[in-house]
């Protein structure tokens, strides 16, 4: 039974039992930014189990795409070296949300395995939690599993409920016992049943885990029964396929065999049992589906994990002798195997292929150098009898050549060598400290503040009359007063000043009363809820306890708000134009512009930029209101608000609806989209692999920018004596004229060179039957020099010629040697002889070569030496 049929039979079986088939969710968890990747079937139902979400069904079944690489669940190191570890796998599951419980879950599992998949009942063993008598009795008395094949597993991990057979979502929350089903491969395979000292052998293989969520665990560890217990089961498709196809390794199933054969084809390897082929076959699945779900290779977070997987696959191909990009070519083979089950893979095939190709090309630019350094170090280590690679070298490979530590460790492991990871960590820590020291210094860093939080009024007000000074800092130290001319940080109990956060710069403005004026140059966070006003006291003395009027620069705030709101609209427009893989990777919003970094693997075309601008300006013209709501985080995400991975959100979040955009945001914004005025993209480029940057301006800045463009167009039109509307046509005419004149000039140079060539032929000196000529051809370019040399060779019949020209301090050289003389006099050697004397070098064929130089003053002497150089070789 093929893997595709196994998947289909599983889903159809549970559909026949009243389950709704739910499509696989994304590998990027949409409801949990703290989770790196979707790693099990229950992830998309987490809020349902917690009671925070309801679905229109109480029974569900899925084939969930899952990844375990990076973070807590990381199988990367073992992939390719064991029979059952993968970075990507499919988890088949059935779920009950307060519907059926243990009895039905157990009977369903047994019926599917024995009646649908036709597994022999006497090959199946089960485990239960040691005091779960209910599950034990169902297996023994209802299903009929003999007692010797039902094993009770206790708390085998050092604490109460710490057991292979007790599942918990976290330290608190839903939890409960589980029952695992094992397949016995028979006595010919080493290993013992679960719970025995030999349980790690390959004879008894876990194929299905049935989790019974029946308790809620509180912070004190107390267990209370859930009013509606739930069921969460998981069976790895690859594992059950290995059992049903009578093989002992997941890599021997049909799905993997096709990918392994494709990997062998691309690497030129005949041995299909090679572990490196298994690595490549596994990794193409993980990499392709991660890219399908919007992850782009990068240097942090999910992107960094993807980059590590890609580079590990490339390194294994390199190890097999494949020294050029090959990995991306396997996408088509993966689509052939899995495209029917996952149409999104087939749809994204061109983009996935392109992303992988670009990543391969980047890595191959550095891999050879890095590998040569590592190989040399390992050879030296082996000669010295060492078994530990220097951590500093491992860090250099990581930092300079893009080798992740685990890739270096992989190479070392094959040689029986370990990496000094503590030394690597020390080097990494030093670099981070240096980066911090070199980074922008924040005036609020290191301030010790223990008072009350600041109340922020900036969403509603631009000034606050009765703000009280609660703390003052000068050069990082807490002080009681600040004198005129001193720079300081002021903390108020109330403020309208927005502190730099979420990419938006802090406000500027003034703190003042009748006797004091403090100019605020920046506003920063001292702590999460404490705002510091950094600036200089221009007048008077400011003391703790003073009351001031806090007033922001309203015009600057308004320009910043326009740019911030435009960023939200641009983000949505980019996703509409380029695809849902576009995700914000960074931003800077100030009064002059917005700078937006996002995941995308290709430069934006002019048409794409125009479309983004048109969409944003359409939203501006709609003059839609900005609607702000504060709500629970879960409600916001369920309502479609974008939550960005890596951002920290509290239980309550601020949601901004602006036109067609909905995002979580704590920044300041316009009241209506029309307040943005005009939106214009002024720059687009790449900042890192897979990361693009767009800069845009709004409002009066955009108007001035367009006016300046208009002025330049008018000036250019006037200079070319044309109307602005005729400018492109006029430029085309001028270009045609230039081409015509250049052609005429070339013809003149050719005629001049021809006439000079006739004169030069008379200067040739015969040496040993060969005419030797070394001369300067005034005003000639490289093309003219070559043509003249060819004509002289024809004219002189047997010759060795060097012609030179000087233009703008640079020397051009062409050497030509006729066929009869080129056995002894090589044109490449001849031109190099001259070039080396004029500060250059060159080379070419024995009959024709060229070179250049930077010291024209030495040219006469160099040419004078040609006769003697040729004579010495004849």
Curated annotation (Swiss-Prot):
Query: Which PROSITE patterns is this protein grouped with?
Result: AA_TRNA_LIGASE_II_ALA
Cellular localisation: Cytoplasm
Q: Which domain of life is it from?
A: Bacteria
- The record's EC number reads 6.1.1.7
Major location (coarse): cytoplasm
Enzyme type, top EC level = ligase
**What CDD domains has UniProt attached to this entry?**
AlaRS_core (cd00673)
Show the catalytic activity.
tRNA(Ala) + L-alanine + ATP = L-alanyl-tRNA(Ala) + AMP + diphosphate
Which GO biological-process labels does this protein carry? Answer: alanyl-tRNA aminoacylation; negative regulation of DNA-templated transcription
Q: Name one GO molecular function term.
A: tRNA binding
Q: Which cofactor does it need?
A: Zn(2+)
Residues the record lists as binding Zn(2+): 564, 568, 665, 669
Q: List the NCBIfam families hit by this protein, alphabetically.
A: alaS
Task: Write out the function statement from the record.
Answer: Catalyzes the attachment of alanine to tRNA(Ala) in a two-step reaction: alanine is first activated by ATP to form Ala-AMP and then transferred to the acceptor end of tRNA(Ala). Also edits incorrectly charged Ser-tRNA(Ala) and Gly-tRNA(Ala) via its editing domain.
What does the comment on domains in this protein's record state?
Consists of three domains; the N-terminal catalytic domain, the editing domain and the C-terminal C-Ala domain. The editing domain removes incorrectly charged amino acids, while the C-Ala domain, along with tRNA(Ala), serves as a bridge to cooperatively bring together the editing and aminoacylation centers thus stimulating deacylation of misacylated tRNAs.
Q: What family does the database annotate?
A: Belongs to the class-II aminoacyl-tRNA synthetase family.
The protein here is known as Alanine--tRNA ligase
This chain's source organism reads Burkholderia pseudomallei (strain 668)
What is the taxonomic lineage of the source species? Bacteria, Pseudomonadati, Pseudomonadota, Betaproteobacteria, Burkholderiales
Q: Which gene encodes it?
A: alaS
């Amino acid at each position: 039974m093929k893997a595709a049929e196994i998947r289909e039979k599983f889903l159809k079986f549970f559909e026949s039992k009243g389950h709704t088939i739910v499509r696989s969710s994304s590998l990027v968890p949409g409801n949990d930014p703290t989770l790196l990747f979707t790693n099990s079937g229950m992830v998309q139902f987490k809020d349902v189990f917690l009671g925070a979400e309801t679905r229109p069904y109480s029974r569900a079944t899925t084939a969930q795409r899952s990844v375990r690489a990076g973070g807590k669940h990381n199988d990367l190191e073992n992939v390719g070296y064991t029979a059952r570890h993968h970075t990507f796998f499919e988890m088949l599951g059935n779920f009950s949300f307060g519907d059926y419980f243990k009895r039905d879950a157990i009977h369903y599992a047994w019926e599917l395995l024995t009646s649908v998949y036709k597994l022999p009942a006497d090959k199946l063993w089960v485990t239960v939690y040691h005091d779960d008598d209910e599950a034990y009795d169902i297996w023994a008395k209802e299903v009929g599993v003999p007692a010797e094949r039902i094993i009770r597993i206790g708390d085998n991990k050092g604490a109460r409920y710490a057991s292979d057979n007790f599942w918990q979502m976290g330290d608190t929350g839903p939890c409960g016992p589980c029952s695992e089903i094992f397949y016995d491969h028979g006595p010919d395979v080493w290993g013992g049943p679960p719970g025995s000292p030999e349980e790690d052998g390959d004879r008894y293989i876990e194929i299905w885990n049935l989790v019974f969520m029946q308790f809620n665990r509180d912070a004190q560890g107390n267990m209370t029964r859930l009013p509606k217990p739930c069921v969460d089961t998981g069976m790895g498709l690859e594992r059950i396929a290995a059992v049903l196809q009578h093989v002992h390794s997941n890599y021997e199933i049909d799905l993997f065999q096709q990918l392994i054969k494709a990997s062998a084809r691309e690497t030129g390897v005949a041995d299909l049992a090679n572990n490196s082929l298994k690595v490549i076959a596994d990794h193409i699945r993980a990499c392709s589906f991660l890219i399908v779900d919007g992850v782009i290779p990068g240097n942090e977070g999910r992107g960094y994990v993807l980059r590590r997987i890609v580079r590990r696959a490339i390194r294994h191909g390199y190890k097999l002798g494949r020294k050029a990009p090959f990995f991306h070519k396997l996408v088509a083979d993966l689509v052939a195997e899995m495209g029917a089950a996952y149409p999104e893979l087939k749809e994204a095939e061109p983009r996935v292929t392109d992303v992988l190709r670009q990543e391969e090309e980047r890595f191959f630019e550095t891999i050879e150098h890095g590998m040569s350094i590592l190989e040399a170090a390992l050879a030296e280590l082996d000669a010295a009898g060492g078994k530990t690679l220097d951590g500093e070298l491992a860090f250099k490979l990581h930092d300079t050549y893009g080798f992740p530590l685990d890739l270096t460790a992989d190479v070392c492991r094959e040689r029986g060598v370990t990496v000094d990871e503590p030394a690597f960590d020390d080097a990494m820590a030093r670099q981070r400290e240096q980066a911090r020291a070199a980074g922008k210094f924040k005036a609020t860093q290191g301030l010790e503040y223990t008072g009350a939080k600041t109340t922020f009024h900036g969403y509603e007000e631009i000034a606050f009359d009765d703000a009280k000074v609660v703390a003052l800092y000068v050069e990082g130290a807490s002080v009681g007063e600040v004198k005129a001319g001193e720079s300081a940080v002021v903390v108020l109990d109330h403020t309208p000043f927005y502190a730099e956060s979420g990419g938006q710069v802090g406000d500027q403005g003034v703190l003042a009363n009748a006797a004091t004026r403090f100019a605020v140059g920046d506003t920063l966070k001292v702590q999460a809820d404490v705002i510091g006003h950094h600036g200089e006291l221009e007048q008077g003395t400011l003391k703790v306890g003073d009351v001031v009027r806090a007033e922001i620069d309203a015009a600057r705030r308004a320009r910043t708000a326009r740019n911030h709101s435009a960023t939200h609209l641009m983000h949505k427009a980019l996703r509409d134009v380029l695809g849902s893989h576009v995700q914000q990777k960074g931003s800077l919003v100030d009064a002059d512009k917005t700078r937006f970094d996002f995941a995308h693997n290709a430069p934006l075309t002019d048409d794409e930029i125009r479309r983004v601008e048109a969409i944003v300006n359409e939203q501006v013209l709609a003059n839609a209101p900005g609607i702000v709501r504060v709500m629970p985080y879960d409600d916001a995400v369920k309502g479609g608000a974008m939550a960005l991975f890596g951002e920290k959100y509290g239980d309550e979040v601020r949601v901004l609806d602006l036109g067609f955009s909905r995002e979580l945001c704590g920044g300041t914004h316009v009241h209506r989209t029309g307040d943005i005025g005009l939106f214009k993209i002024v720059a687009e480029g790449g900042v890192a692999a897979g990361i693009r940057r767009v800069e845009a301006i709004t409002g009066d800045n955009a108007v001035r920018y367009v006016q300046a463009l208009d002025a330049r167009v008018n000036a250019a039109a006037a200079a070319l004596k044309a109307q602005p509307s005729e400018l492109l046509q006029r430029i085309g005419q001028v270009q045609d004229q230039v081409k015509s004149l250049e052609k005429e000039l070339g013809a003149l140079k050719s005629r001049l060179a021809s006439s000079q060539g006739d004169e030069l032929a008379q200067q040739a000196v015969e040496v040993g039957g060969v005419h030797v000529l070394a001369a300067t051809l005034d005003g000639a370019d490289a093309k003219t020099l070559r043509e003249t040399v060819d004509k002289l060779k024809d004219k002189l019949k047997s010759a060795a010629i060097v012609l030179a020209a000087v233009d703008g301090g640079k020397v051009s050289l062409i050497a030509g040697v006729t066929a009869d003389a080129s056995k002894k006099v090589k044109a490449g050697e001849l031109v190099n002889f001259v070039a080396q004397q004029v500060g250059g070098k060159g080379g070419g064929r024995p009959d024709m070569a060229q070179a250049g130089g930077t010291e024209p003053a030495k040219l006469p002497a160099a040419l004078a030496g040609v006769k003697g150089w040729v004579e010495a070789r004849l």
